[in-house]
Amino acid sequence: MISNFSRLQNIYNILFILFISLPGGLIYLLTGSTLSFWLRESGFDKITIGLFSLVNFIHIFKFLWGPLLEKISFIPSNSRGYKYCLIFSLLSCICCVYILTGFNPTTNFISFSLCLIILAFFSSIYDMLLQSSQMLLINNKNWGISEAACTSGFRIGILISGSGALYLSTIISWQEVYRTMAILCVPSLLLIIFYPLKFKEKIAVNDFDRFWHAFYDFIKKPKWLIIVGFMLLYRLQDNFLAVMPNMFYLDIGYTKKDLALGYKAFGMCATIAGGFIGGFLCRKYEYTYIFKRVLVYHALSSITFLLLYSYSQTITTLYIAVFLQEFTKGLTMSPFFSYQLRCCSSKYCITQIALITSIAYISTVLFGSISGYAATYLGWGYFFAIASFCFIPAYILIRYLPRV
């Protein structure tokens, strides 16, 4: 009876994680890919659009406020403080998105940029809480499934703020599009308020020295430097491409409606499918076995950019290219995020997850910010050729990764 109740509670918690992941995906694109379309229509060039990736630099430093967030979240240890933090961070994100719509990116450049940075700050807090929710609510053996659910919820959010926002922008202004996205986050906020959160185990409340304890606990792990290097390099290909595929598809003649349906909507479905398959693979195979294969598959998918650039640019070839790119991206993501959880200790979950994801975000910000320069000065052909080889550094590190 207890076992059945525990299993049912796990299912409810996994569904809860799926639904609260949705605003994370919604907000993610509002400072990234969707923003690039708004900036493009406002007259910004590829270099400037690429540099806007720097607004997400705040994610690099989230490990600094991780201990404070952990302290607040676990007072009291019955999950009430954790729920308050979820509510506050998501509500702040919604308000920031709404305020952002009051600025014009060309005439209010500074205010617009500052609002984006503040949005990225609260988004980073929400992301930390979201990722740690799996460790706090879900049994270890179900982390692969919960990560697939988290990724799927996140991707559905991206689908809405990607495909949905792009399609809406052909009907209404970008300011109205962003207001719509803010409103769509409200149901998840209400779910967080009314859902009866319960941790799978009692969390001890520690002092502010817990950052050093969390850091020391992490560096005691075998081959921790290899883990750090792997986190930094694993998504190098996607980080190098950044938002440039948006510009590429527009440059070779596709319309926003083509991209809303073919690239964003269909591509997101392919990513979700790949994410679920990747999550189930985590239950069957060892992580290094999965990483070796999915990295190569995803690298090969970059060749489709070159084929589109050199040959046919039909709707059919767009769908084929997008499926191969996004499905393999989904395959790479679930095992990676699940592995991140395995590298953390439950008692330091927020701080250590913040530390690991901060390391991963260095690559996102650094290579995303130079992608515009690379695409402009190398040309699309060389740009995508280089992207297809970006998997090599992470692939070399796989053989040295510790088993977790």
UniProtKB/Swiss-Prot annotation:
Chief subcellular location: membrane
Question: Where does this one sit in the cell?
Answer: Cell inner membrane
Keyword terms:
Cell inner membrane, Cell membrane, Membrane, Transmembrane, Transmembrane helix, Transport
Coiled-coil positions are none
**What Pfam family does this protein match (any one)?**
MFS_1
- Give the transmembrane region(s): 11-31, 49-69, 84-104, 109-129, 154-174, 177-197, 224-244, 261-281, 294-311, 315-337, 353-373, 378-398
* Membrane-protein topology: Multi-pass membrane protein
- Which GO terms of the molecular function aspect are on file? transmembrane transporter activity
Q: For this UniProt entry, what's an example GO CC term?
A: plasma membrane
In which domain of life is the source organism classified? Bacteria
**SUPFAM superfamilies (alphabetical):** MFS general substrate transporter
* InterPro entries xref list: AmpG_permease/AT-1 (IPR004752), MFS (IPR011701), MFS_trans_sf (IPR036259)
The family note in this entry says:
Belongs to the major facilitator superfamily.
Name under which the protein is recorded: Putative transporter AmpG 2
What organism does the UniProt record list as the source?
Answer: Rickettsia bellii (strain RML369-C)
Q: Which lineage is the organism of this entry classified under, starting from the top rank? A: Bacteria, Pseudomonadati, Pseudomonadota, Alphaproteobacteria, Rickettsiales
